[in-house]
Regions:
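Catalytic cores of DNA base-excision repair glycosylases
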Residues: 2-218
């Protein structure tokens, strides 16, 4: 676990590099918040960029939950094929539409329990919805948050749920949503999975991996 001064330095650096706003990386119509849920389901094992290419046509073809619920499943599959795992995802979209209509009057629930009861929705997807739709402080553990949080010494766990709770324990609640966005931005720009730009990283002094593996090689 990280010291409080180190955490303050990390958060201050992230805020300076990536000033927080509430813009979601996934595009959706704010008048139809269920679209963010569906876009996040599609983002599993797929890039946000690809999802943002697919969803405009998808939501034009199926503009309502009722349209998804009544659709021929093969039509949904065709529309989302390029996102990968399209058969499973199509089933999740249709079943979630039906559950939202049957159990929630077509409205998104805000609590973890009801969100994760929807088809294809785990804590990551639920927390995206909670943070962006309901402005509820939430930690979203995607691959960037998992990788970089471990490097920074904020967690030693590999289980996303355990990482989520490690971060919740250490980070001030007011920073939770911003941390998600900022770490994802940092993971895309600097701390990439395959070829991290360690020498250009302004977090390297706080990075346990850099201290252990990179610095000794320079001596």
């Amino acid at each position: 676990m990280k010291s409080k001064p180190a955490i303050r330095r990390i958060l201050a650096t992230l805020e300076r590099l990536y000033p927080h706003d509430d813009t979601c990386f996934l595009n959706y119509d704010h008048a139809h918040p269920w679209q963010l849920l569906f876009a996040t389901i599609l983002s599993a094992q797929c890039t946000d960029a690809r999802v943002n290419i697919v969803t405009p046509a998808l939501f034009s073809q199926f503009p309502t939950l009722e349209a998804f619920a009544a659709a021929n499943i093969t039509d949904i599959e065709k529309a989302i094929r390029s996102t990968g795992f399209y058969r499973a995802k199509a089933g999740h979209l249709q079943q979630s539409a039906r559950l939202l209509l049957a159990n929630h009057g077509g409205q998104l629930p805000s609590d973890i329990e009801n969100l994760t009861a929807l088809s294809g929705v785990g804590r990551k997807t639920a927390n995206v919805v909670r943070g962006h739709i309901f402005d509820i402080p939430s930690i979203t553990v995607d691959t960037h948050v998992m990788r970089i949080s471990r490097k920074l010494g904020l967690t030693a766990n590999t289980c996303p749920v355990k990482i989520e709770f490690d971060l919740m324990e250490q980070l001030p609640k007011k920073h939770w949503i911003a941390y998600n966005q900022q770490i994802i931005s940092h993971g895309r720009a600097i701390c990439t999975a395959r070829s991290p730009k360690c020498e250009n990283c302004e977090l390297k002094k706080e990075c346990e991996e850099y201290k252990c593996k990179i610095q000794p090689k320079a001596h």
